[in-house]
């Protein structure tokens, strides 16, 4: 069962990510909570996107709040990222950017 508090935090932070980096070049998946497309570049419309980032909610929220760095999480195997544009390090953390 999905925790409603974590669900809200994941959805709000992903919405802010999309606001900061509009587009459809990267698919960010935080199962089982949400998935979004963001980032400038070639638009994805069908099938598996060329650029995919997937991680659990705990890792995502740690990145959002600056409790973990992208490179560290990637090196620890907490992030599954494929594709040339599958890197959100320049956008994280989001803690000071999330709208109230």
Feature names for model-found ranges:
Residues 1-100:
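Feature captures hydrophobic
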């Amino acid at each position: 069962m999905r925790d409603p508090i974590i669900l809200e935090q994941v959805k709000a932070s992903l919405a802010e990510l999309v606001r900061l980096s509009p587009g459809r070049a990267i698919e960010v998946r935080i199962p089982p909570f949400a998935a979004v497309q963001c980032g400038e570049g070639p638009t994805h419309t069908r099938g598996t996107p060329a650029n995919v980032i997937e991680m659990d909610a705990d890792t995502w929220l740690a990145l959002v709040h600056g409790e973990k760095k992208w490179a560290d999480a990637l090196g620890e195997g907490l992030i599954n990222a494929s594709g040339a544009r599958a890197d959100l390090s320049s956008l994280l953390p989001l803690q000071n950017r999330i709208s109230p």
